[in-house]
Design a protein with these regions (language model features):
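Active-site-adjacent "lid/gating" segments in soluble enzymes
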Residues: 24, 28, 90-169, 173
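Hydrophobic alpha-helical segments, chiefly the membrane-spanning helices
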Residues: 179-181
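Short glycine-/small-residue-rich Rossmann-like dinucleotide-binding loops
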Residues: 14, 61, 85-86, 112-113, ...
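A structured beta-alpha segment of the ubiquitous adenosine-cofactor-binding alpha/beta core
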Residues: 10, 51-101
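Helix N-cap at the beta1-alpha1 junction of Rossmann-like dinucleotide-binding domains, i.e.
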Residues: 38-41
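N-terminal Rossmann-fold NAD(P) dinucleotide-binding loop
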Residues: 18-19
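A short, aliphatic-rich alpha-helical micro-motif
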Residues: 4, 71-75, 123
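Short beta-strand "acidic-cap" motif of Rossmann-like dinucleotide-binding folds
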Residues: 11, 27, 31-36
Length: 181
């Protein structure tokens, strides 16, 4: 139940904002299918709270068969989102152009640290970097003392709230959203 009931969304497994975004979308009623790398199975926590409410599959994304499995999911999905560095989905054969060929209504969401272009686009993005460079870290802690890194991922969690996926209603062409945390 929830306002997103009836939406089918593919989460390309990653760290930080991706799993959180999928968790929130699932909490709001969306059907989330998490696509894990086959090599990652058994390496994470079995009690990862961000996986609640999701179904998941393990796929070898570097094989043609694995890519085809994901593209079959894309054919009936409302949205897909990922948080990889620029160009990764394209190299895998799962970029927005290919996904929209399979499903013209697909919403393709990207969450990266620094966006798809610019001087930091290919740099790994981590929450502490975002909140430091934006000045948010300076607001955390006691007056007159050095900043205190937060115990949660403020930037990532904020970025994880990609509820723009609701704009699925009637797009005239595939919708592509790129969100730099």
């Amino acid at each position: 139940m929830g306002p997103l009931k009836g939406l089918k969304i593919i989460e390309m497994a990653g760290i930080g904002p991706g799993p959180f975004c999928g968790m929130v979308l699932a909490d709001l009623g969306a059907e989330i299918i998490r696509v894990d790398r086959a090599s990652a199975i058994g390496t994470g926590s079995k009690q990862d709270a961000s996986n609640r409410g999701k179904r998941s599959i393990a796929v070898d994304l570097k094989s043609e068969k694995g890519v085809e499995v994901v593209l079959k999911l894309v054919e009936t999905a409302d949205a897909i989102f990922e948080g990889f560095r620029p160009g990764v989905m394209e190299r895998l054969g799962l970029g927005p152009d290919i996904c929209s060929e399979r499903n013209e209504r697909i919403v393709f969401g990207r969450m990266t640290g620094w966006g798809q272009e610019g001087p930091l686009a290919n740099a790994a993005g981590h929450d502490i970097n975002y909140i430091s460079l934006t000045g948010a870290l300076a607001a955390i802690g006691r007056p007159g003392s050095p900043p205190v890194p937060p115990l949660n991922l403020i930037g990532d969690f904020g970025g994880g709230g990609m509820l723009s996926l609701i704009h699925i209603s009637e797009p005239t062409r595939p919708l592509y959203i790129s969100y730099a945390v």
